[in-house]
């Protein structure tokens, strides 16, 4: 594990290490386009800057409901860089399941994909967001331009359009929670499994 001095670390350091040592190497391919480690790191920095400037703070839990698209990776590492906890969950969940996870985890915010006509992800998330007691901010990765934004519901570009390409990653300890993965809940309510930065 690549860590900061003094025993402090952050899982996002793995991305930063790759961006520093192999900046032009491919981090991922999407729709025939290569995205380098340096590009992923810059986008994660922009999102981390956007999160903190929106009032999200170290230790806050940020839910992420998104399919396998580049924005998932950018947001995932941006959340970690900001010292927040990533809370990824399945795009097929219905609003009552999403609401349970948001409130059970005490998520402060959620980033979600708008979806498709067949799978309108953001519509389900919006219903849960409006009923949630803990979640106060929602950002939508637009895909169809059909989704109506509203009070505390913004376009993802608000986060990703930060002018700053740099970010001082928040240092965490090995005991700090980095990710919470929820079980499927097949035998009862889903349970959150916490993973640390270690």
Segments the model singles out, each with a brief description of its role:
Residues 3-11, 24-69, 73-77, 94-99, ...:
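Conserved AMP-binding/adenylate-forming core of the ANL superfamily
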Residues 24-26, 139-140, 161-182, 189, ...:
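Conserved pre-ATP/AMP-binding loop-to-beta segment of ANL
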Residues 32, 116-174:
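ANL superfamily adenylate-forming
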Residues 57, 108, 136:
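Short acidic/polar active-site loop segments enriched in Thr and Asp
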Residues 62, 79, 110, 177, ...:
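Conserved S/T- and glycine-rich ATP-binding loop of Class I adenylate-forming
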Residues 77-82, 103-104:
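Short hydrophobic alpha-helices that are characteristic scaffold elements of the AMP-binding
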Residues 87, 93-127:
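Conserved ATP-dependent adenylate/AMP-binding module captured primarily in the ANL superfamily
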């Amino acid at each position: 594990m690549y860590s900061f001095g003094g025993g402090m670390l952050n899982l996002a350091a793995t991305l930063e290490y790759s961006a520093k040592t192999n900046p032009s190497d491919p981090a991922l391919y999407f729709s025939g386009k290569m995205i380098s480690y340096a590009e992923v790191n810059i986008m994660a920095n922009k999102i981390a800057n956007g999160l903190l400037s929106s009032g999200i703070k170290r230790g806050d839990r940020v839910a992420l409901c998104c399919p396998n698209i580049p924005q998932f990776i950018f947001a995932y590492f941006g959340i970690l860089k900001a010292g927040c906890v990533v809370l990824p969950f399945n795009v097929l969940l219905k609003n009552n399941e999403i609401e349970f996870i948001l409130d059970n985890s005490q998520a402060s915010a959620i980033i979600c994909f708008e979806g498709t006509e067949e799978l309108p992800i953001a519509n389900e998330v919006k219903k849960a967001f409006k009923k949630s007691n803990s979640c106060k901010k929602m950002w939508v990765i637009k895909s169809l331009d059909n989704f109506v934004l509203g009070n505390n519901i913004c376009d993802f570009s608000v986060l990703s359009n930060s002018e700053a390409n740099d970010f001082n990653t928040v240092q965490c300890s090995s005991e700090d929670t980095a990710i919470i993965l929820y079980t499927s809940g097949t035998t009862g309510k889903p349970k959150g499994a916490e993973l640390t930065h270690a």
